[in-house]
Amino acid sequence: MRKKASPKRPKQKRLSPNDRRKEFVAKATEFFSEEGFGGGTRDLARRLGVTQPLLYRYFPSKDDLIKEVYRTVYLEPFDTGWEKLLTDRSRPIRDRLQDFYEAYTKVIFTRKWLRIYLYSGLKGLDINRWYVGVVRDKILSRIIRECRHEAGLPVHSKPTASELELAWVFHSGIFYYGVRKYIYESPVLEDKEKMISNALDAFLAGFERVFGTELPVGHAPMKAVG
């Protein structure tokens, strides 16, 4: 009786070095989000389905791979025009902030993004310190400057510690909505846009109230409700 020929395995597509590197970063992102940063490169290579020497050809150390994950997951989204959106004074500040936080939360409100961020904080890695600096300099400082401009205050001096703390309270409240929903799986207001809108009303009114003593006499207050 004639034996059936075993089916041929489909040939695996040979990846270019750049595509292979991207694949490693994508799989490492999944690995770090599920397992944290405690494992060694041997476990990581096994999870990626490659040998340790091959992984080392692309990333000489685990720290190098972590830095690349940080760059692709946390820094690349800032190249999408967010900074221009925040500083476009042809539009009311409230509209700009609403649009920004809707776009921003579409990126960070994923289980993967949040887990990596929280794991890195527990492990004491630099990712959190780097990202906190990015948020402070590229987001919160700009928001404070735009709030000052809207209120008729000087915009060229650095944000004060009090201004930054108020901005952090506002920003962190939105961030923690994502933690409650995607990490704790707790009930939240499902209308995310409404949550952002409510937070903006409180922040803009609070900024006006806390720092309004510095306003020029007769200046119209910022509009909280759009």
Report each predicted region and the residues it spans:
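N-terminal intrinsically disordered/low-complexity leader segments
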Residues: 1-19, 85, 211-226
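Hydrophobic/aromatic residues within well-ordered alpha-helical segments
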Residues: 20, 62, 69, 73-74, ...
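Helix-turn-helix
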Residues: 23, 27, 31-68
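Amphipathic alpha-helical segments that line or abut small-molecule/effector binding pockets
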Residues: 26, 94-109, 114-119, 164, ...
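Amphipathic alpha-helical linker/stalk segments
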Residues: 69-99
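Short secondary-structure transition hinges
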Residues: 83, 88-89, 95, 106-144, ...
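Amphipathic alpha-helical packing segments from all-alpha helical-bundle domains
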Residues: 126-153, 165-168, 197, 201
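Hydrophobic alpha-helical segments that form the core
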Residues: 140, 156-183, 191-206
